[in-house]
From Swiss-Prot:
The modification Phosphotyrosine is found at residue 309. This is Twinfilin-2. Residues 322-349 are annotated as: Disordered. It comes from Homo sapiens (Human). Residues 330-339 have a biased composition (Basic residues).
Length: 349
């Protein structure tokens, strides 16, 4: 399988970044095209930064397409002019695009130069990234106040970006709900599974590029399934389980998350665990694959035919009580009385 490279800025965009940092540009729009960061648009300053803001920013916010905007302020620090970083992810854009732009956000800041960025905003509607929205953001930073939905999402994205500094103590706050984007080959494999063109998919996380990539789609039956599970690395597996239940032939998609315990680093274990739920959401919602059973294992040897069948069709442990004679009334009972019939006592009366 040919592994795709991560998303980075083109040479033309890098050159434009260098030119813009000198102060001749007010606004830069960056978009993702053909797995690369490219220049989408730019504008020169007309007036002060606050006068230029809305007329420069708002027309560039597409209702369907995420993007990044870098907006130059008039203030300077030791490295030169200060900039705002605006991440636009409209509600109407496809989920896969949102995930791709969220995962690439840190790369854009790194390519531009994080030391030049004074502040950043995240927006899902235009009001979030308007000049008034920026003023509200500054006010919320200055005083403790409830965060807007956009600010909460930005806060979660910032938390996710810290995932490279993982410790046992920080795992719950840094790794909730990570969404690594599926590489195109992995997406195609899921579509093929939906069409039953393949019956097995194995995926892994690329921790450097922050993506979910396809390992292989080798044809696999139940007997071969245990041998597909690596003993020294975590994996996600999707298996089309063909079997018979109560006389009916069935085909059930089973998701298997294999994690060989402490043979994997803490970082790897936590990233796989955190990305799992968002991956399954995408598989069920975007690819319309119904997952019959979700299984977690530590060793491939667990995947026997009996184990799979019992997981997909759990046994109903109904308690059946044997028939017993009804008990008599509770409490103490008197002595038995012997009632003799006529003539039984020897009398002829």
């Amino acid at each position: 399988m040919a592994h795709q490279t991560g998303i980075h800025a083109t040479e033309e965009l890098k050159e434009f970044f260098a030119k813009a940092r000198a102060g001749s540009v007010r606004l830069i729009k960056v978009v993702i095209e053909d797995e690369q960061l490219v220049l989408g648009a730019s504008q020169e300053p007309v007036g002060r930064w606050d006068q230029d803001y809305d007329r420069a920013v708002l027309p560039l916010l597409d209702a369907q397409q995420p993007c990044y905007l870098l907006y130059r302020l008039d203030s300077q620090n030791a490295q030169g002019f200060e900039w705002l970083f605006l991440a636009w992810s409209p509600d109407n854009s496809p989920v896969r695009l949102k995930m791709l732009y969220a995962a690439t956000r840190a790369t854009v800041k790194k390519e531009f130069g994080g030391g030049h960025i004074k502040d950043e905003l995240f927006g899902t509607v235009k009001d979030d990234l308007s000049f008034a929205g920026y003023q509200k953001h500054l006010s919320s930073c200055a005083a403790p106040a409830p965060l807007t939905s956009a600010e909460r999402e930005l806060q979660q994205i910032r938390i996710n970006e810290v995932k490279t500094e993982i410790s046992v103590e920080s795992k719950h706050q840094t790794l909730q709900g990570l969404a690594f984007p599926l590489q195109p080959e992995a997406q195609r494999a899921l579509q093929q599974l939906k069409q039953k063109m393949v019956n097995y998919i194995q995926m892994k996380l690329d921790l450097e590029r922050e993506t979910i990539e396809l390992v292989h789609t080798e044809p696999t039956d139940v007997a071969q399934l245990p041998s597909r599970v690596p003993r020294d690395a975590a994996r996600y597996h999707f298996f089309l389980y063909k079997h018979t239940h109560e006389g009916d032939p069935l085909e059930s998609v089973v998701f298997i998350y294999s994690m060989p315990g402490y043979k994997c680093s803490i970082k790897e274990r936590m990233l796989y665990s955190s990305c799992k739920s968002r991956l399954l959401d995408s598989v069920e919602q975007d690819f319309h694959l119904e997952i019959a059973k979700k299984i977690e294992i530590g060793d491939g040897a667990e995947l026997t035919a009996e184990f799979l069948y019992d997981e997909v069709h759990p046994k109903q442990h109904a308690f059946k009580q044997a028939f017993a004679k009804p008990k008599g009334p509770g409490g103490k009972r008197g002595h038995k009385r012997l009632i003799r019939g006529p003539g039984e006592n020897g009398d002829d009366s």
